[in-house]
């Protein structure tokens, strides 16, 4: 599955430092803690947060944050149905993506190398489905 939204895309010179943003583009349910606090933010850590929220929806069917205050504080609440099994390594990846401190939050290299994702496509189909 690939999800892409180019609504706020800009061309960035890779030799220049990544810019900070002050305007928010998107849906608040997926907005990073620093964005909700109206702090200047960098796009890569904010996008990793969004990935964490998306993982919660895909794995549990629910948002990891009951309220905006919970999102700002990084208080994750996993509402998992008894019939749903979320692998511990998947939950660990989601929590790394949802760290309220953008400096401590996982980066794309950590996500890409995470044990839950590495080798997943080598598994038989029935083992890839949660």
Residues of each region from the PLM?
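Short proline-rich PxxP-based motifs
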Residues: 73-84
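Terminal C-lobe "cap" of eukaryotic-type protein kinase domains
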Residues: 100-104, 108-124
């Amino acid at each position: 599955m690939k999800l892409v939204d180019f609504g706020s895309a800009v061309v960035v010179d890779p030799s220049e430092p990544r810019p900070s943003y002050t305007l928010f583009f998107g849906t608040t349910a997926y907005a990073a803690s620093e964005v909700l606090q109206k702090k200047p933010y960098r796009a890569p850590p904010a996008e990793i947060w969004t990935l964490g929220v998306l993982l919660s929806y895909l794995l549990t069917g629910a948002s990891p944050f009951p309220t905006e205050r919970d999102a700002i504080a990084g208080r994750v609440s996993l509402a998992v149905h008894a019939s749903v099994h979320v692998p511990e390594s998947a939950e660990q990846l989601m929590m790394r993506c949802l760290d309220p401190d953008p400096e401590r939050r996982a980066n794309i290299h950590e996500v890409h190398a995470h044990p839950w994702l590495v080798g997943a496509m080598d598994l038989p189909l029935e083992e890839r489905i949660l």
